[in-house]
């Protein structure tokens, strides 16, 4: 049964109804509409913690979607799933693919930085200072890019950049 027919959650149902209405009135081709339906079902499954189902829907949406911007969001959401399941290598790969398609996607830049920061912390805990500093520097570069695009976001990252001496004054303007 399609996910759209089994949403128990009021917000999910409301989103699904609105998305269906928008799909019907927007002048777009059937392939794009089908891609969006899979993307919507992927988001719903992801919100419910059904990651395998979400990935299946995202894969199908990716197969059908031609628009680079829309593809970037599909890849980004797939990256979120892999990151939450601890597969940081695959998450980074997907976030980078998303940025290749949409370079002004601050949330993907932020998540790349978060992964590098996490890896830096792990390297630091295992006593590898050089590796941890290199990973922290990578995190800093991606956070700076995200902050340049969305200067009012990522306050914790801005504070981390300042306290670790990795910020430059122009990064925030």
UniProtKB/Swiss-Prot annotation:
Transmembrane segments: none annotated. SUPFAM superfamilies: TPR-like. GO terms for biological process: photosynthesis. It is found in: Cellular thylakoid membrane. It comes from the Bacteria. Pfam families: TPR_1, TPR_7. TPR repeats lie at residues 35-68, 72-105, 120-153. Keywords: Membrane, Photosynthesis, Repeat, Thylakoid, TPR repeat. It is a peripheral membrane protein. GO terms for cellular component: plasma membrane-derived thylakoid membrane. PROSITE patterns: TPR, TPR_REGION. Essential for the assembly of the photosystem I (PSI) complex. May act as a chaperone-like factor to guide the assembly of the PSI subunits. This is Photosystem I assembly protein Ycf3. It comes from Picosynechococcus sp. (strain ATCC 27264 / PCC 7002 / PR-6) (Agmenellum quadruplicatum). The gene is ycf3.
